[in-house]
């Protein structure tokens, strides 16, 4: 094996070096503290587990992003987690089994066989929060507000939010009695805003339903879109109108809480259609070609664990959050250099300083005081008689 092959990393897999790793860790603690202040409890999930659990209710997209291996002990297929959300849903449905609402949060590395986009990392640090047990728009407003509070904490500038609701398309598709194949084709056409294909795929439907499905292509824009949708989808089935009501309620409450936040609505945006069941949302910033935080409602995810509960939540990549955020992350700097010595009094002094939160670096055999600068030390312990004192490091 050539030397270059020993240090070469796969595409999309990166190592994080100091001080960037320290900045990410400080940000992780700050965000988890924020989540805790909202009542969200931290959970830790396995990096690898049986494939059936990882892919529950998640659709084919997650299947394609999951690295798969065979467990040498059981012979069963396992996967490295590509999304922590299904794991947290299992904790709520099967392990905790709470009757009332449950608020959970997490932060951990995930691994993607396929990146989200060409330039995306395949080893992001997924961080997010989930609220289980409440089906009202209030839960959606809470998790969206928490997501925005997280972005404010990181001081991410020029945030824009997209809002949609998969229940609108799903309700119309069911009313039209579309086959699975045609529904998927229509879904693909709507994502591309391919109006000619949408017209062709709905040509054999009753005129009113065809017109409403075609309307989803251009029902996108500002707050006025919701008023237009009320008119153009007036004859829609009750579930579609209920979805519009939910979306309007969420939008009004977000506008009241975050009056400076630009809101964009796209009723043909079906992000996570095979996974989400209600409102879907994503945050974008100029110059970044994909969402930096996203989420939505997914009420069916716990069914395979024997307990389907209403659920809504969001996630982000912590590394992206730190890269885009402008908040000052203050890292501890400097330290105290200690000579290589077996003196008992020195050891007691070192222990005391460390217990006080000081950074203390002890020289190894053969190291000279000149190595202190490389160790980022600005002070040193100097012996005066039987005592040791902290003194500035000589220039």
From Swiss-Prot:
Keywords, comma-separated and alphabetical: Amino-acid biosynthesis, Cytoplasm, Histidine biosynthesis
Chief place of localization: cytoplasm
Gene3D superfamilies attached to this UniProt entry: Bira Bifunctional Protein, Domain 2
Gene Ontology biological process: L-histidine biosynthetic process
InterPro entries listed in its UniProt record: aa-tRNA-synth_II/BPL/LPL, HisRS-like_core, HisRS/HisZ, HisZ
Cellular localisation: Cytoplasm
Keyword Cytoplasm among record annotations: yes
CDD domains recorded: HisRS-like_core
Listed GO CC annotations: cytoplasm
Entry superkingdom: Bacteria
Any Pfam family hit: tRNA-synt_His
Pathway this chain belongs to: Amino-acid biosynthesis; L-histidine biosynthesis; L-histidine from 5-phospho-alpha-D-ribose 1-diphosphate: step 1/9
Additional notes on this entry: This function is generally fulfilled by the C-terminal part of HisG, which is missing in some bacteria such as this one.
Similarity comment: family membership: Belongs to the class-II aminoacyl-tRNA synthetase family. HisZ subfamily.
Assembly notes: Heteromultimer composed of HisG and HisZ subunits.
Function: Required for the first step of histidine biosynthesis. May allow the feedback regulation of ATP phosphoribosyltransferase activity by histidine.
Protein name according to UniProt: ATP phosphoribosyltransferase regulatory subunit
Species of origin: Pseudomonas syringae pv. syringae (strain B728a)
